[in-house]
Amino acid sequence: MTHPLIPQIIDLATPIAEKLGLEIVEVVFQTNKRPPVLRLDIRNLSSDTGLDDCEQMSRSLEATLDATELIPGSYVLEISSPGISRQLTSDREFIAFKGFEVIVKTYTPYENQKEWRGNLQGRDEQAVYLNKKGRAIAIPRQLVAKVQLNDQRTT
């Protein structure tokens, strides 16, 4: 279940990220740790996400969070890149990574295979859509076990 502060944190972080040429990919607030950990995954919209991107986002967001006192008490702020082998789960991620190379694994074979590679075109209630060398593929959503970014780049 999503922490109730997440929407407010996203509202604060998004304009900061946009000003830096970044995008918020995921926000997690781990309140079961002491002190609690607020983790944001970011990506650079124009180049590979680097340490400088994480540092700039961290400094800017920390100042804003401290000024608003949204999070009471002490907490740890972690800013990182989601990484190339990231598993996609949310609608937001499927939109953000449209056009990226992905690997789709299915629970049971679909058209005689359990692993598909191609460029992500999107997903809806019925299917995950790929483009594999110009061929459109729609994999039924109920068969999809996971979708992750392809770090092998062999499509």
Curated annotation (Swiss-Prot):
GO CC terms, sorted: cytosol
SUPFAM superfamilies reported for this sequence: YhbC-like, C-terminal domain (SSF74942), YhbC-like, N-terminal domain (SSF75420)
The cross-references to CDD domains, in alphabetical order and at most eight, read: YlxS_C
Pfam families (UniProt xref): DUF150_C, RimP_N
Question: InterPro entries of this UniProt entry?
Answer: Ribosome_maturation_RimP, RimP_C, RimP_C_sf, RimP_N, RimP_N_sf
Tell me the compartments it is located in.
Cytoplasm
Biological process terms in GO annotation: ribosomal small subunit assembly; translation
Enumerate the UniProt keywords alphabetically: Cytoplasm, Ribosome biogenesis
Residues spanning the membrane:
none
Family assignment from sequence similarity:
Belongs to the RimP family.
Q: What does this protein do?
A: Required for maturation of 30S ribosomal subunits.
By what name is this protein known? Ribosome maturation factor RimP
